[in-house]
Regions:
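Start-of-domain marker
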Residues: 23-48, 52-53
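Solenoid-like repeat scaffolds
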Residues: 31-33, 64-69, 101
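Alpha-helical segments in soluble extracytoplasmic regions
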Residues: 43-51, 57-75, 79-83
């Protein structure tokens, strides 16, 4: 009987502890990962997969995904920039171009954080890049939007 309980307990710990930290090549940072429940991690995983398929609703939901603020926000920005690199700036630009000004709010900050503090070239060093040089179309989109 004790073996059954121990086996069940082990199964529960393994199941709950199996959060995804890499989803189709998109890295989820340690801080964001640590502050997620298993269910939240599965929702984030689903949003990442759908965003890579250029699902507009998923991209919007990803921007609004609860991240706990501070370092979690930077890590969500890093997820977004990794997605942009994977699907291409042109595709991400097309998606955002279809959104209202209200829906676009927030993306600029996340992208800036992801470029500056993320490791998008996976060399173990923060990139410290700027949107104007890295994603000029998106930069122009945000400039136009703020001038409305």
């Amino acid at each position: 009987m004790i073996k059954v309980y121990l086996s069940l307990l082990l199964f529960v710990f393994l199941f709950v502890g199996c959060k995804s930290e890499n989803v189709q090549g998109i890295i989820i940072g340690d801080t964001l990962l640590a502050h997620q429940s298993f269910g939240e991690n599965q929702k984030l995983k689903e949003l990442i997969i759908k965003s890579l398929k250029k699902d507009e609703v998923a991209i919007l939901k990803l921007k609004d995904f609860p991240n706990g603020g501070a370092a979690g926000s930077y890590e969500l920005g890093y997820i977004i920039t990794q997605i942009i690199y994977k699907i291409g700036e042109d595709e991400f630009y097309k998606t955002l171009s279809g959104f209202s000004s209200e829906e676009i709010k927030g993306f600029e900050g996340y992208i800036n954080a992801g470029l500056e503090y993320g490791d998008n070239d996976y060399d173990g060093i923060m990139d410290n890049k700027r949107m104007k040089q890295e994603f000029p179309k998106l930069y122009d989109l945000f400039e136009i939007d703020t001038n409305k």
